[in-house]
Amino acid sequence: MSRCLIIINPVSGGGAARRYALDLQWKLSTLFETIEVKFTRGEGDATRFAKNACERGFDAVFCMGGDGTVNETVNGIAQGGFSCTFGFIPVGTVNDMSRALGIHQNPTQAI
């Protein structure tokens, strides 16, 4: 059974991540049988969520947020043994990582 985790920073981009969460879930439902969604509440949450997902055998971890959320999620995947595929939807203010990688800055287009 294929499983993915979506980590959402609900305050990223002035709350924009919440608006795009259902779009991402719908898109990923065509690729994964099980989708789990977790919302961050503070520093370190994304790291903990991503690490736990990798340790539990999830196939992929996606995050919606800014550069801080991306950084925490990648660190969690690293701590979990790099066993998960990673993806992200830029919903932050600056989004340096997505700009460097050429990912569309419009969340709908990135999805």
Residue ranges and their predicted role:
Residues 1-61, 75-76:
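ATP/NTP phosphate-donor binding region
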Residues 10, 64-66, 89-91:
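Glycine-rich beta-strand-to-loop/alpha-helix junction loops that act as flexible
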Residues 12, 70, 93:
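Short, glycine/acidic-enriched loop or turn micro-motifs at the edges of active sites
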Residues 30-31, 40, 55, 78-111:
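Catalytic core of DAGKc-family lipid kinases
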Residues 48, 72-73, 96-97:
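Phosphate- and divalent-cation-binding pockets in alpha/beta enzyme and binding domains
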Residues 60-68, 72:
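Glycine-rich N-terminal segment of FAD-binding domains in flavoprotein oxidoreductases
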Residues 69-81:
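Short Gly/Thr/Asp-enriched flexible loops that form oxyanion-binding sites at enzyme active sites
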